[in-house]
Structures are given as C-alpha cells and as structure tokens.
Amino acid sequence: MTGGGKSGGKASGSKNAQSRSSKAGLAFPVGRVHRLLRKGNYAQRVGAGAPVYLAAVLEYLAAEILELAGNAARDNKKTRIIPRHLQLAIRNDEELNKLLGHVTIAQGGVLPNIHQNLLPKKTGKTGKTLSQEL
C-alpha cells in the first residue's frame, strides 16, 4: 500500500480551497446567495452563474447607496452614517428613489421641502412698477 497519509487521495499539487466570491472578485457571499435562491423556491433549478450575477448586483447597489450616504454624512459634518443619511441619499437620487420609492426607512425622516405658496412674497420694487402693471 502506498501513500496512506492525511492527504486522502488528493493529487499532488492541488490548490487550496477558494470561495466563489473570491473567484468572482466580490465581497458579497456567492454561496449564501446560491443557497437562498435554492431554498426560496423561485425555480426548480438554479444555474451556476445566477448567484454570482445577483451577488454582483447587490454589491453594486450597496456600494452606490453607501457612497451617497457617506457624502450626505460628510455634508452634515458627521463621521458616522445614520438612517437619516441613507434616506437623504436615496431620495435625492432619481434612480434610487424610483427603485426604492415605496420603501420606508426607520428613523429616516423626510426631505426638507417648503411649498412655493407658503414662502413670503418678494417686495423689492418701488411704486412705479406697481402703477405700470395696472
């Protein structure tokens, strides 16, 4: 008998295990997304590329929202992103607002907005212009 060591039958020169996330260059977990797609009964079978693509899309959306929220936090002279910054980031971006239009963010507040009819009228003109208008 030969080679009864711990290597078990692996060929010499085998590589270390590498996750599908690292193969795809992603931070989001491809294996977890694949498991959730299988368990969610979305389809009978799930292809090998679908969880990689979905994880990449989720990672892109998260990065986009966090970048805009970080800008909102910096505008408010804060170093920590809070739900208010997420709300401002999403509602001020046209595409994200369309995507997440019906989403409620807890502790997010509302966008500052004063209707034009409620603002005071500008009166910087003299009486001459008033007589000309009539």
Curated annotation (Swiss-Prot):
Record's compositionally biased regions (Gly residues): 1-11
Could you state a single Gene Ontology molecular function term? DNA binding
Give the UniProt keywords, A-Z. Answer: Acetylation, Chromosome, DNA damage, DNA repair, DNA-binding, Methylation, Nucleosome core, Nucleus, Phosphoprotein
Q: Which residues carry the post-translational modification N5-methylglutamine, per the record? A: 107
Phosphoserine modifications at = 131
Q: Name its cellular compartments.
A: Nucleus; Chromosome
Q: What residue intervals hold the motif [ST]-Q motif?
A: 131-132
Gene Ontology BP terms: DNA repair
Q: How is it modified after translation?
A: Phosphorylated to form H2AS128ph (gamma-H2A) in response to DNA double-strand breaks (DSBs) generated by exogenous genotoxic agents and by stalled replication forks. Phosphorylation is dependent on the DNA damage checkpoint kinases MEC1/ATR and TEL1/ATM, spreads on either side of a detected DSB site and may mark the surrounding chromatin for recruitment of proteins required for DNA damage signaling and repair. Gamma-H2A is removed from the DNA prior to the strand invasion-primer extension step of the repair process and subsequently dephosphorylated. Acetylated by ESA1 to form H2AK4ac and H2AK7ac.
- N6-acetyllysine modification, residue list: 6, 10
Query: Where are the residues marked Not ubiquitinated as a site?
Result: 121
Q: Name one Pfam family in it.
A: Histone_H2A_C
Q: Give the principal location in a single coarse category.
A: nucleus
The cellular component terms of Gene Ontology attached to this UniProt record, alphabetical and capped at eight, are:
nucleosome; nucleus
Disordered, as annotated region: 1-25
Q: Which InterPro entries does the record match to this protein? A: Histone-fold, Histone_H2A, Histone_H2A/H2B/H3, Histone_H2A_C, Histone_H2A_CS
Q: What is known of its domains?
A: The [ST]-Q motif constitutes a recognition sequence for kinases from the PI3/PI4-kinase family.
What else does the entry mention about this protein?
In contrast to vertebrates and insects, its C-terminus is not monoubiquitinated.
Q: What does this protein do?
A: Core component of nucleosome which plays a central role in DNA double strand break (DSB) repair. Nucleosomes wrap and compact DNA into chromatin, limiting DNA accessibility to the cellular machineries which require DNA as a template. Histones thereby play a central role in transcription regulation, DNA repair, DNA replication and chromosomal stability. DNA accessibility is regulated via a complex set of post-translational modifications of histones, also called histone code, and nucleosome remodeling.
In the record, the note on similarity to other proteins reads: Belongs to the histone H2A family.
Q: Assembly state and interactors? A: The nucleosome is a histone octamer containing two molecules each of H2A, H2B, H3 and H4 assembled in one H3-H4 heterotetramer and two H2A-H2B heterodimers. The octamer wraps approximately 147 bp of DNA.
Protein name stated in the entry: Histone H2A
User: What organism, scientifically named, is this protein from?
Assistant: Chaetomium globosum (strain ATCC 6205 / CBS 148.51 / DSM 1962 / NBRC 6347 / NRRL 1970) (Soil fungus)
High-level lineage: Eukaryota, Fungi, Dikarya, Ascomycota, Pezizomycotina
